[in-house]
């Protein structure tokens, strides 16, 4: 289980990213449309004045139950060992173990 502080930090980053998503997207769109270099620098300064944790690259996918940062399956939002336990105990409907 990950430390609770790390899980809370990740939740805080998700909230910030959602809050500034539209602003960040509009500023990036303006940069691509304006031909003047001096205006691009001004808009770039506005973009850099946004909080660092509001950037989508700062987010890290974590396991929904344990908060584990590695070995996650996107479809389920779970880490590998938790996914395996849940499939073995039939807690995930429709998931079957492969056999050949």
Swiss-Prot record:
Alphabetical GO CC annotations of the entry are: chloroplast; small ribosomal subunit
Similarity comment: Belongs to the universal ribosomal protein uS14 family.
Compartments, as annotated in UniProt? Plastid, Chloroplast
Note whether Membrane occurs among the keywords: no
Write out the transmembrane intervals: none
Q: Name one Pfam family in it.
A: Ribosomal_S14
Q: Tell me the Gene Ontology biological-process terms attached to this UniProt entry.
A: translation
One GO MF term attached to the UniProt entry: rRNA binding
Biological role: Binds 16S rRNA, required for the assembly of 30S particles.
Name of the featured protein? Small ribosomal subunit protein uS14c
- Per the UniProt record, the source organism is Lemna minor
């Amino acid at each position: 289980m990950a430390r609770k502080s790390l899980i809370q930090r990740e939740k805080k980053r998700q909230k910030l990213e959602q809050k500034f998503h539209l602003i960040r997207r509009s500023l990036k769109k303006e940069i691509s449309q304006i031909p003047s270099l001096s205006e691009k620098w001004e808009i770039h300064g506005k973009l850099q004045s946004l909080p660092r944790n509001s950037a989508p690259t700062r987010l890290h996918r974590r396991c929904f139950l344990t908060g584990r940062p590695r070995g996650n399956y996107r479809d389920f939002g779970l880490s590998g060992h938790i996914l395996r336990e849940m499939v073995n105990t039939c807690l995930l409907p429709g998931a079957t173990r492969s056999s050949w």
